[in-house]
């Protein structure tokens, strides 16, 4: 089975993406929309630089791990199905695994500490797709280890992953309006704007990367209706990539240091970003609620 290499895919995809960004900038200036700002774009470039460095530093090890695990695969998918079905199955499985990785990155606090970097922009444009966390290349590895074990060829999985990543760029724009029935099947600009919204009705919605049907199946789908407010519920207030990267980690460390038990330590690290320990009914202290959270905790919420 002959597929394009990742280098060939990037050679085609990157110029197209750069052209899209250029056209969006022209559109922004012409329509006086202010879709881009120098500070926000600078923060994105700082985060992207760190992400690329970590990715290049670890990709050999990660690929080696995938191919090592492939030796112990449960089935050999390449021997069971025709090429077109292998490619289709790989793309669908990559997208499904990504859905759960993405969902976990919003609902597990230490993963959110990484992923919130991507949501730290209060803008929505094609360049925001490249606002990637420094530790992002590492956080997704455990989720995708299942693929070589099941029997998906790592070389095909890699190609599918690159294609899916490039498709994800398309969703980061205000330039393209709703697309009707396509919004209910694919991750379109409309559905992904919802995902980046800090509106209460949009929080933790639309995790899909290629297909949005996973969200419809697992109950996390939302249509774009009210105007989207981009960013975090409480924004970090800086474009410094170092400050953004360690913003939530700092609050996790503070919470862990004041934890009263191992249970609370685990809750602060592995629980949802808005997790707080319950107050015992017989305690003299008032019952805690989300409204009594510290500023440090609240500032990381979506």
Residue ranges and their predicted role:
Residues 2-17:
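Hydrophobic transmembrane alpha-helical segments in integral membrane proteins
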Residues 2-6, 35-40, 76-83, 117-118:
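Helix-boundary and loop/linker segments of multi-pass membrane transporters
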Residues 12, 35-52:
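Loop-to-helix transition at the N-terminal end of transmembrane alpha-helices
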Residues 16-28, 91-96:
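Central hydrophobic cores of alpha-helical transmembrane segments in multi-pass inner-membrane proteins
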Residues 22-42:
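Membrane-interface helix-loop junction between the first two transmembrane segments
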Residues 49-61, 76, 81-232:
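Membrane-embedded catalytic scaffold of the fatty acid hydroxylase/desaturase
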Residues 68-78:
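Membrane-interface helix termini and inter-helical loops of multi-pass transporters
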Residues 228-302:
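Cytosolic-facing loops and C-terminal tails of multi-pass membrane proteins
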